[in-house]
């Protein structure tokens, strides 16, 4: 006698771990690019994040009297830690990433019951809380190290992360101040603060958008794009969410360029100067907090693109990917409810 079960009809205990591992592998080129342009601080943040994430997952497993591998082997906590570590400034104080990992795993993930139960993307919950609570530390990005007169050594990187200054006593903001013509360390931040004074052409001709610095941000985004396309090719993620997110943002940004020329950065600069590619392929596609229906994925991705556009163009935060993902997460139950495909043989 056969047992009747509903789909899915294939099961694998290591399917989640395989998914998470592929996502992390696809992030490695961008991680390498980020370390190349911003120095050793990237690896230090990743090391702290991964170490603490594994420790928390083990502790939660013991508290719930589950096998240690129950929470650790699925790699979800490790992936969350890696995403958050890449998202914060490489030379942010160590306690920033510590608070972020605790919030992401304990508050945003395990307080809901663990993997598969959380309503919001854990890494983005932590990032948004850190950005609102510690704006100075979370905006302390350094320019690419090749633009600095004295790039931080590995010892300087450790000193910056754990004490706030290099071995010579320079803080991140003092190192940034040594580079002429740069008011903020990221292109979107600089454009936000300099647009009224310099205009679009002046901003695009400033050091932050020319030469090595511009190439640094572009190459990091191109690496995320390549990794995302790999995930689509391997069918780890679906194409609908990133396509809808990028398409909606590009459409609205392009219309703004046509209707209000010379008031904002052009579409290409907007797409490749912030966290857009990272968000589209590695954050918005989180299978737990994203929509699960084919039409729902398109709506979900389009909503994120819309929110990013509104916040970037009319809000106070220059990037806005984290807040946009969280706002779209709120809409997921409603989206899934109204986009469920009709079952074969059922009525309208």
From Swiss-Prot:
Source organism superkingdom: Bacteria
One family name in Pfam for this protein: NQR2_RnfD_RnfE
Function: Part of a membrane-bound complex that couples electron transfer with translocation of ions across the membrane.
S-S bonds: none
TM ranges: 15-35, 36-56, 67-87, 88-108, 125-145, 212-232, 241-261, 265-285, 298-318, 320-340
Entry's localization field: Cell inner membrane
Residue numbers carrying FMN phosphoryl threonine: 186
Family named by the database record: Belongs to the NqrB/RnfD family.
Cofactor: FMN
NCBIfam families: PRK00816.1, rnfD
Protein name as catalogued: Ion-translocating oxidoreductase complex subunit D
InterPro entries: NqrB/RnfD, RnfD_bac
EC number: 7.-.-.-
Native source organism of the sequence: Actinobacillus pleuropneumoniae serotype 5b (strain L20)
GO CC annotation: plasma membrane
Quaternary structure and partners: The complex is composed of six subunits: RnfA, RnfB, RnfC, RnfD, RnfE and RnfG.
Keywords linked to the UniProt accession: Cell inner membrane, Cell membrane, Electron transport, Flavoprotein, FMN, Membrane, Phosphoprotein, Translocase, Transmembrane, Transmembrane helix, Transport
Record's bilayer topology term: Multi-pass membrane protein
GO biological process, one term: transmembrane transport
């Amino acid at each position: 006698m056969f047992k009747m079960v509903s789909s899915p009809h294939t099961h694998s205990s290591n399917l989640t771990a395989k998914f998470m591992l592929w996502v992390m592998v696809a992030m490695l080129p961008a991680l390498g690019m980020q370390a190349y342009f911003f120095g050793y601080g990237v690896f230090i943040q990743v090391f702290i994040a991964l170490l603490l994430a594994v420790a928390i997952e083990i502790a939660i497993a013991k508290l719930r009297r589950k096998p240690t591998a129950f929470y650790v082997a699925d790699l979800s906590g490790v992936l969350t830690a890696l995403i958050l570590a890449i998202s914060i400034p490489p030379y942010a104080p160590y306690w920033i990433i510590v608070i972020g990992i605790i919030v992401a795993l304990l508050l945003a993930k395990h307080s809901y019951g663990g993997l598969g139960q959380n309503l919001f993307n854990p890494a983005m919950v932590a990032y948004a809380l850190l950005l609102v609570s510690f704006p100075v530390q979370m905006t302390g990005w350094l320019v690419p190290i090749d633009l600095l007169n004295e790039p931080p050594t590995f010892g300087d990187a450790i000193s910056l992360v754990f004490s706030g200054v290099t071995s010579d006593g320079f803080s991140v903001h003092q190192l940034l101040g040594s580079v002429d013509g740069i008011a903020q360390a990221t292109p979107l931040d600089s454009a936000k603060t300099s647009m009224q004074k310099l205009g679009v052409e002046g901003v695009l001709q400033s050091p932050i958008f020319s030469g090595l610095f511009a190439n640094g941000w572009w190459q990091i985004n191109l690496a995320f794009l390549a990794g995302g396309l790999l995930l689509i090719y391997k069918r780890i993620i679906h194409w609908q969410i990133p396509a809808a997110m990028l398409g909606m943002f590009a459409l609205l940004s392009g219309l703004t360029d046509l209707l209000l020329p010379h008031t904002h950065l052009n579409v290409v600069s907007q797409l490749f100067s912030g966290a857009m590619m990272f968000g589209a392929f590695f954050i918005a596609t989180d299978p737990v907090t994203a929509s699960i229906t084919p039409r729902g994925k398109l709506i979900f991705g389009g909503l994120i693109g819309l929110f990013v556009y509104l916040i970037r163009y009319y809000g106070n935060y220059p990037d806005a990917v984290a807040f946009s993902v969280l706002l779209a997460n709120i809409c997921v139950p409603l989206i899934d409810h109204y986009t469920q495909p009709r079952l074969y043989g059922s009525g309208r």
